């Protein structure tokens, strides 16, 4: 009985530890689900910015493009180039996916530096860039995983899984492990960089006058854009790899 009681207490302790969270969070109860309100709010703001900007810029296309139309055409051309370089000639259907990933991450990253999230008071926790939350980056990475599995299966059918035993069946465990590490590396790279950037700026602002952290903030904007490009480029590369069947 003592052994059973000890085991029960140990399991209860592990369960309690698993419920520990970092920081405070605001949750909404929707049906039987508990959703992370902070991430939803900031994500909706980012989506609204993207949709609003696109609608305003291209609602009345001109033969001689306006500044807004010209900007979005340049962004589209840039995303097409990235997709074509990484995926190949069959890049066309994947441009919307790669573009959505790039623009959402780019605007999310910049919103952490440019939008005054902190002045909005919540009952629990505080608002921050969507990509400052591990839930967002993991979701984006899992979407990428689903996309490259779908691309491979659509192109090759069940023959897609033969890649796991190439060039030799001995590499089967390593090839399987690789598919698990891809979303992990994508999500933690993005989350870590954005979180570290925001923490550095917050610490500098609290320690020194406002003028001093400005160069660091500009550097943060640059690295935030680079992180969006890296994520989109790797997503396109994984999709291209799954369609070609080589590593």
UniProtKB/Swiss-Prot annotation:
One Pfam family this sequence matches: ATP-synt_A
Primary subcellular site in the record, as a coarse category: plastid
CDD domains linked to this entry: ATP-synt_Fo_a_6
Recorded superkingdom: Eukaryota
Residues spanning the membrane: 38-58, 95-115, 134-154, 199-219, 220-240
Gene3D superfamilies xref list: ATP synthase, F0 complex, subunit A
Keywords (A to Z) from UniProt: ATP synthesis, CF(0), Chloroplast, Hydrogen ion transport, Ion transport, Membrane, Plastid, Thylakoid, Transmembrane, Transmembrane helix, Transport
Membrane topology: Multi-pass membrane protein
Keyword Protein transport included in the entry's annotation: no
A single GO cellular-component term on record: plasma membrane
GO molecular function annotations of the record: proton-transporting ATP synthase activity, rotational mechanism
PROSITE patterns: ATPASE_A
Keyword match Hydrolase: no
Compartments reported by the entry: Plastid, Chloroplast thylakoid membrane
Role of this protein: Key component of the proton channel; it plays a direct role in the translocation of protons across the membrane.
Quaternary state and interactors: F-type ATPases have 2 components, CF(1) - the catalytic core - and CF(0) - the membrane proton channel. CF(1) has five subunits: alpha(3), beta(3), gamma(1), delta(1), epsilon(1). CF(0) has four main subunits: a, b, b' and c.
Similarity comment text for this entry: Belongs to the ATPase A chain family.
Protein name as catalogued: ATP synthase subunit a, chloroplastic
